[in-house]
Amino acid sequence: MAIILGIDPGSRLTGYGVVAHQGSKFTYLGSGCIKLADHEFHIRLKMIYQGITQLIEQFSPETFAIEKVFMAHNPDSALKLGQARGAAIVGAAMADLPVFEYSARQIKQAVVGNGGADKTQVQHMVKNILKLPGTPQADAADALAIAICHAHSEQNLIKLAGSASKTVRGRLRK
């Protein structure tokens, strides 16, 4: 079973979700949030890095998946989100994990089947896919959704590669 660490980055709260998958079967391993709210920004970045490092040591994931930056209404918010992502990605890079990035639309499409789904729909589907007894907190659910999205992306690439008989100009052809 492949273990995936999914991260929903944030400068005040960073969600994480860990799942194992084999084929279409998922196993929930853990989720939660790295709480950062009451610290100076540079300390929060350090806490993200340290939190990611601890999660990698605890769960030994084989891959790391993270949400891409979206353009917020406030440019300062987008910059802080980018820095939070950077701190998380460095944690993965220091552990030599491959890093995969997905947009919010890709994640929602993979988990809910609708790229415009809202947070409650994502939480509901994550709960159902992973057969959780309760609804996960929003940031943890988003991180689990990122991990599920990555698993689906891997499965689709494997199917595509298996169905291709040759390549033409670098593209797979049947």
From Swiss-Prot:
It is found in: Cytoplasm. The keyword tRNA processing does not apply. Mg(2+) 1 binds at D8, D139. GO terms for biological process: DNA recombination; DNA repair. Its cofactor is Mg(2+). InterPro entries: RNaseH-like_sf, RNaseH_sf, X-over_junc_endoDNase_Mg_BS, X-over_junc_endoDNase_RuvC. Mg(2+) 2 binds at E67. Pfam families: RuvC (PF02075). Its EC number is 3.1.21.10. Its main location: cytoplasm. PROSITE patterns: RUVC. The keyword Glycoprotein does not apply. The RuvA-RuvB-RuvC complex processes Holliday junction (HJ) DNA during genetic recombination and DNA repair. Endonuclease that resolves HJ intermediates. Cleaves cruciform DNA by making single-stranded nicks across the HJ at symmetrical positions within the homologous arms, yielding a 5'-phosphate and a 3'-hydroxyl group; requires a central core of homology in the junction. The consensus cleavage sequence is 5'-(A/T)TT(C/G)-3'. Cleavage occurs on the 3'-side of the TT dinucleotide at the point of strand exchange. NCBIfam families: ruvC. This is Crossover junction endodeoxyribonuclease RuvC. It comes from Pseudoalteromonas translucida (strain TAC 125).
